[in-house]
């Protein structure tokens, strides 16, 4: 059977389910796809995934870390959604920190029978740390709770929890429903109130989660992978465009690894030996730079729109430390630990200068906030992902949560 062409007519938004173990994240993911597949939402489209298909998530590797993660896609009349679901708690932490699947918005699933639990809090905290901008709440298992007052109480608790982590707890949509109830209604061919709750959730996602700014509309940035000298023409840098657009004649800055950025002009752009009149995100290109010597530029710097990104040495980060079983360290590390930090194409030694209060050491398998000082400045911004390596192996992954210099 021929594959359907990916239609770019609808806005694209990345979402994912988060929340405590057994509160029904995978069941909800299944219910969303099956309600849409049943044609019960006008303009909606999906392939129905059973719970088992979502729960046995395939393994993926991101920055040297193995994560179990399921990707599904579906459409409402307004949008195309890419949706991620992770079976295990550790998988969520790893996914959110490595950015294996970035989220424009998250669906926080809370069991009405239990209310917010420890992992509910941890996921909301992480969502805040790694900049998931919007959260929509699905209060699941409402078919198991007869007491209206209990539902009110759980909703209040969830709103307070969101406010505590700087989400607008009073404005966040909270949908009361039952994912399993919706699947049962579909099975009995009698869509009712629980299928209605899934439709309500989709509507809340469409209305409440804004469409993210497209990569192509952001300021241009390309991590430099390689530098060549072409006799008679000058210096060429190669790399893959991360965001924005570059056209011949554009002014650019070379940022990182040196104290000051270097201004230059992109005189010509090539891809697969053909000259390009514009480079877009994802393009692997070579850029000829005006008046730049081969020694003025190196791998690990970035080529960027002037003024759009600065180089920094000090930052705070949320880090996941690989366990011994994942090929990580076998022993803890302490303040003054000095591994290599990999940002895009840059590989720079840094020192862990601060751990959270009361934390003396970090064990393999931990998820921790720490402060780092690099020996050379790197083009950094909040939300940037990195890997931590020592002796050629990955021992951790992190995300920059705050620039400190």
UniProtKB/Swiss-Prot annotation:
Which parts of this chain are annotated as the region G4?
140-143
Superkingdom of this protein's organism = Bacteria
The answer, when asked if Plastid is one of the entry's keywords, is no
Q: Where does GTP bind?
A: 19-26, 85-89, 140-143
Q: Which residues bind Mg(2+)?
A: 26
Sample GO molecular function, one term: translation elongation factor activity
Which EC class is this protein assigned? hydrolase
Cysteine pairings via disulfide bonds: none
Compartment(s) where it occurs, according to its Swiss-Prot or TrEMBL record: Cytoplasm
Q: What is its main location?
A: cytoplasm
Question: One of this protein's Pfam families, by short name?
Answer: GTP_EFTU_D2
Family matches, as InterPro entries: EF-Tu_GTP-bd (IPR041709), EF-Tu_GTPase (IPR050055), EFTu-like_2 (IPR004161), EFTU_2 (IPR033720), G_TR_CS (IPR031157), P-loop_NTPase (IPR027417), Small_GTP-bd (IPR005225), T_Tr_GTP-bd_dom (IPR000795)
What chemistry does it catalyse, as a reaction equation? Answer: GTP + H2O = GDP + phosphate + H(+)
Could you tell me which residues belong to the region G3?
A: 85-88
Q: Residue ranges of region G1?
A: 19-26
Which terms are listed as keywords in the entry?
Cytoplasm, Elongation factor, GTP-binding, Hydrolase, Magnesium, Metal-binding, Nucleotide-binding, Protein biosynthesis
Q: What is its EC number?
A: 3.6.5.3
Gene3D superfamilies linked to this entry:
P-loop containing nucleotide triphosphate hydrolases (3.40.50.300), Translation factors (2.40.30.10)
* Keyword GTP-binding among record annotations: yes
Gene Ontology terms, cellular component aspect? cytosol
Q: Where is this region: G2?
A: 64-68
Describe the protein's quaternary organization and the partners it interacts with.
Answer: Monomer.
**What is the similarity comment for this entry?**
Belongs to the TRAFAC class translation factor GTPase superfamily. Classic translation factor GTPase family. EF-Tu/EF-1A subfamily.
Q: What does this protein do?
A: GTP hydrolase that promotes the GTP-dependent binding of aminoacyl-tRNA to the A-site of ribosomes during protein biosynthesis.
Q: Which NCBIfam families match?
A: EF-Tu (TIGR00485), PRK00049.1 (NF000766), PRK12735.1 (NF009372), PRK12736.1 (NF009373), small_GTP (TIGR00231)
Q: What's the protein called, per UniProt?
A: Elongation factor Tu
Q: List the taxonomic lineage.
A: Bacteria, Pseudomonadati, Aquificota, Aquificia, Aquificales
């Amino acid at each position: 059977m021929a594959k359907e062409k990916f239609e770019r007519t609808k806005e694209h938004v990345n979402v994912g389910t988060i929340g405590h173990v057994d509160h029904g994240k995978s069941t909800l993911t299944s219910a969303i796809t099956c309600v849409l597949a049943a044609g019960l939402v006008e303009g909606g489209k999906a392939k129905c995934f059973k719970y088992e298909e979502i729960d046995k998530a395939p393994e993926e590797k991101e920055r040297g870390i193995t994560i179990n993660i399921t990707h599904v896609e579906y459409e409402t009349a307004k949008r195309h959604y890419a949706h991620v679901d992770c079976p295990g708690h550790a998988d969520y932490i790893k996914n959110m920190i490595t950015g294996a699947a970035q989220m424009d918005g998250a669906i926080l699933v809370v069991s009405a029978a239990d209310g917010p639990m420890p992992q509910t809090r941890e996921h909301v905290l992480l969502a805040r740390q790694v900049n998931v901008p919007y959260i929509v709440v699905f209060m699941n298992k409402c078919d198991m709770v007869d007491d209206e007052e209990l539902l009110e109480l759980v909703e209040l608790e969830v709103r307070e929890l969101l406010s505590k982590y700087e989400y607008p707890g009073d404005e966040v949509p909270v949908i009361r429903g039952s994912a399993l109830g919706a699947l049962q209604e579909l099975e009995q061919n009698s869509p009712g109130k629980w299928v209605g709750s899934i439709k309500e959730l989709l509507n809340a996602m469409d209305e409440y989660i804004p469409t993210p700014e497209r990569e192509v509309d952001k300021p241009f940035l390309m991590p430099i992978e390689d530098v060549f000298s072409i006799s008679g023409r000058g210096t060429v840098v190669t790399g893959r465009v991360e965001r924005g657009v570059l056209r011949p004649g554009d002014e650019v800055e070379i940022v990182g690894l040196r104290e000051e950025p270097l201004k230059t002009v992109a005189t010509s752009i090539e891809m697969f030996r053909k000259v390009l009149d514009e480079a877009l995100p994802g393009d692997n290109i070579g850029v000829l730079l005006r008046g730049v010597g081969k020694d003025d530029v190196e791998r690990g710097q970035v080529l960027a729109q002037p003024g759009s990104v600065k180089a920094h040495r000090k930052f705070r980060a949320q880090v996941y430390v690989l366990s011994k079983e994942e090929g990580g360290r076998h022993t803890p590390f302490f303040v003054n630990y000095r591994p290599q930090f990999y940002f895009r194409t840059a590989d720079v030694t840094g020192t862990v200068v601060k751990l959270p209060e009361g934390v003396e050491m970090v064990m393999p398998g931990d998820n921790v906030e720490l402060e780092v000082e690099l020996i050379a400045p790197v083009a950094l911004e909040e939300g940037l992902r990195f890997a931590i390596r020592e002796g050629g192996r990955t021992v951790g992954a992190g995300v920059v949560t705050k620039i400190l210099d």
